[in-house]
From Swiss-Prot:
Family that this chain belongs to: Belongs to the heme-copper respiratory oxidase family.
Native species: Strongylocentrotus purpuratus
Binding residues annotated for Cu cation, in chain numbering: 240, 290-291
Protein name stated in the entry: Cytochrome c oxidase subunit 1
Topology within the bilayer: Multi-pass membrane protein
Covalent cross-link 1'-histidyl-3'-tyrosine (His-Tyr), where: 240-244
Catalytic activity: 4 Fe(II)-[cytochrome c] + O2 + 8 H(+)(in) = 4 Fe(III)-[cytochrome c] + 2 H2O + 4 H(+)(out)
Pfam families reported in the protein's UniProt record: COX1
Binding site for heme a3: 376
UniProt-recorded Gene Ontology molecular function terms: cytochrome-c oxidase activity; heme binding; metal ion binding
Sites where the protein binds Fe(II)-heme a: 61, 378
Cofactor needs: heme; Cu cation
Length: 517
């Protein structure tokens, strides 16, 4: 019975739970890799004594965190659990395809870990640029395994996004028009289209790389009339939308959390928030070359990409100010999800500001491939996406499990994590401005102080992670009843009769009634 329930599941709640559990495990693997990186960099001199191994760990850390932690949790976990509940649907549109979409992820993960375990590992960075990833500089099957891993993860995402798009278009309860769709549903909807348009480009690029490596094509080899810069264009045409794929569901979640704990019926500027997400999605495809300012583009091209990148700050700023407007003057409950959300509003904005700095192609010439870039994207991912996952998890945990997390210890966890990530990544801005390059396992003595502080912060973050595992155990062990929200919320997911909602949510089709005041 249990085998058929979890292995052959066609239930959106069970599949969402599988995604959340898988993402948690993958997150621990990715965190372990980041600890190896920070241990190597804690002091000058070598710990691993092998740059190739160091680069393999860096590559695997990035790919694990992106494809096996953030995406499965945000889109697979929260998306599967919440979207049917929020739109009043009995399940997803294609339940069996949903199951397949999940079960492609563990084999993909195994392939990625295998790529690190055979030959010399794939020490290419997550960008897999040729000629470093060619069969001359990376002989053996490591890069091929990594490519197959990405193919599988991409196939999984494609199946998932077909499901989400179909569900959101066709399975809304009567009365729920698109302009009444909860913001989290909108965010996953936009994210699904970003995946739909960007993943095939990645698939094409890595397939071309695969043939270059194995059957003597020369797409990226100048000796045969190819161009390695073509790979960079293809990769970043996927890679830039990808970073918005990672953060957009988080935007949706924190809009819900802020609305909920401000005691409001709906978010401030609902329509503006929706259009801002769509604008971010569209603009995300028009700025890819800002990752390649140093490849020798002419000045007009660089001017365009600088300007277009800065324009993305407008809809993003609109979201930040809408969140602040919602908080302003409301009777806040200082609950755990709200703390995470306020952390995001502050720290994501900080990361966005360093992004504006890097958008200037002339400044990026100096800062490209330094730790300033590392600091920038870890502020928006480690303190945007990851904090959003914690905000969403702590907010909806009573809905998922029927139990509530320990309120005080949850806040303790937040403060440990807050100190840890800031201590890890803030000093990296200084290292970058001082010229320390990325992806090196050793550095001159002048950089010792900030690297040591950064590594201490990393240790604190690990303590926070272990404390979080204890929090989850504690919640299930003590079985405190989940606290039902005191006031009805505009979002449907809290309206069901039990926590968690029954295995099959409905006995009959629900309908939404709009009360005009």
């Amino acid at each position: 019975m249990q085998l058929s329930r979890w292995l052959f599941s066609t239930n959106h709640k069970d599949i969402g739970t599988l995604y959340l559990i898988f993402g948690a495990w993958a997150g621990m693997v990715g965190t372990a890799m980041s600890v190896i990186i920070r241990a190597e960099l804690a002091q000058p001199g070598s710990l691993l004594n092998d740059d190739q191994i160091y680069n393999v760990v860096v590559t695997a850390h990035a790919l694990v965190m992106i494809f096996f932690m953030v995406m499965p949790i945000m889109i697979g976990g929260f998306g599967n659990w919440l979207i049917p509940l929020m739109i009043g649907a009995p399940d997803m549109a294609f339940p069996r395809m949903n199951n397949m979409s999940f079960w492609l992820i563990p084999p993909s993960f195994i392939l990625l870990l295998a790529s690190a375990g055979v030959e010399n590992g794939a020490g290419t960075g997550w960008t897999i640029y040729p000629p470093l990833s060619s069969n001359i500089t990376h002989a053996g099957s490591s890069v091929d395994l990594a490519i197959f891993s990405l193919h599988l993860a991409g196939a999984s995402s494609i199946l998932g996004l077909i499901n989400f798009i179909t569900t959101i278009i066709n399975m809304r309860t009567p009365g729920m028009s698109l302009d009444r769709l909860p913001l989290f549903v909108w965010s996953v909807f936009v994210t699904a289209f970003l995946l739909l348009l960007s993943l095939p480009v990645l698939a094409g690029a890595i397939t071309m790389l695969l043939t270059d490596r194995n059957i003597n094509t020369t797409f990226f080899d100048p000796a045969g009339g190819g161009d390695p810069i073509l790979f960079q264009h293809l990769f970043w045409l996927f890679g830039h939308p990808e970073v918005y794929i990672l953060i957009l569901p988080g935007f949706g979640m924190i809009s819900h959390v802020i609305a909920h704990y401000s005691g409001k019926r709906e978010p401030f500027g609902y329509l503006g928030l929706v259009y801002a997400m769509i604008a971010i999605g569209v603009l995300g495809f028009l700025v890819w070359a800002h990752h390649m300012f140093t490849v020798g583009m002419d000045v007009d091209t660089r001017a365009y990409f600088t300007a277009a990148t800065m324009i993305i700050a407008v809809p993003t700023g609109l979201k930040v100010f809408s969140w602040m407007a919602k908080l302003q003057g409301s009777n806040l409950q200082w609950s755990l999800p709200l703390l995470w959300t306020l952390g995001i509003v502050f720290l994501f904005t900080l990361g966005g500001l360093t992004g504006i700095v890097l958008a200037n192609s002339s400044i990026d010439f100096v800062l490209h491939d330094t730790y300033y870039v590392v600091a920038h994207f870890h502020y928006v991912l480690s303190m945007g996406a990851v904090f959003a996952i914690f905000a969403g998890f702590t907010h909806w945990f009573p809905l998922f499990s029927g139990y509530s997390l320990h309120p005080l210890w949850g806040k303790v966890h937040f403060f440990i994590m807050f100190v840890g990530v800031n201590l890890t990544f803030f000093p990296q801005h200084f290292l970058g401005l001082a010229g320390m390059p990325r992806r090196y396992s050793d550095y001159p003595d002048a950089y010792t102080l900030w690297n040591t502080i950064s590594s201490i912060g990393s240790t604190i973050s690990v303590v926070a992670m272990l404390f979080f595992l204890f929090l989850i155990w504690e919640a299930f062990a003590s079985q405190r009843e989940g606290i039902t929200p005191e006031f009805s919320h505009a979002s449907l997911e809290w309206q069901y009769t039990s926590f968690p909602p029954s295995h099959h949510t409905f006995d009959e089709t629900p309908s939404t009634i709009i009360i005009v005041k």
